[in-house]
């Protein structure tokens, strides 16, 4: 067990740690690794945000994430070959209770131009374009619904709902525009994470809400 520090010792330790951290980031920037320094810095800011939210976080206010659900989660800045950053992922819990503050996911990565699908590692599985196609179909259905609304005859409440759903459709379109059409499941990097790390979907207007991969 670590030695219990006095208040002054804690402050000194904090200052030493920050100085070392500053030196490390400065070294990265000056050593032509500016991008890495920025990723670490952004992750620290995100991590502080998670810690600030942690005390009042209630998973009961989130959605229920079923097996096969597609989510976007922040995996953090990790070491070595551990997957990190903001990633799509597949929920694999058989029955994750709404009150459960964590869930288990398989991270996904996109197919790159240089990726040879015939030479994937044994812990990688190509799952095709299913996520892209399902999100595209979701957008088509929403746009079809919106196009059927008779705006001149709509009430104020209906117009407000129309504006909300139109904004929702635009966010879905923006997500589709950023997506690659092929995904690879990194089954060797299954991980359990806090639902605090969920970027999307967190409510019924989440872009990925309702998206699930097929069982096969």
Model-derived segments and spans:
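C-terminal terminal-subdomain/extension
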Residues: 1-50, 54-55, 63-66, 117-216
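Short, surface-exposed secondary-structure edge patches
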Residues: 60-64, 80, 94
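Loop/turn positions that initiate beta-strands
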Residues: 68-70
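Short, charged beta-turn/beta-strand-edge "cap" motif at the junction between a beta-strand
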Residues: 74-82, 96
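Short beta-strand-centered aromatic/proline hotspots
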Residues: 84-95
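Residues located in well-ordered beta-strands
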Residues: 88-90, 104, 186
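Short, conserved beta-turn/loop elements at beta-strand boundaries and strand-helix junctions
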Residues: 94-100, 111-112, 192
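Short solvent-exposed strand/turn elements
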Residues: 103-119
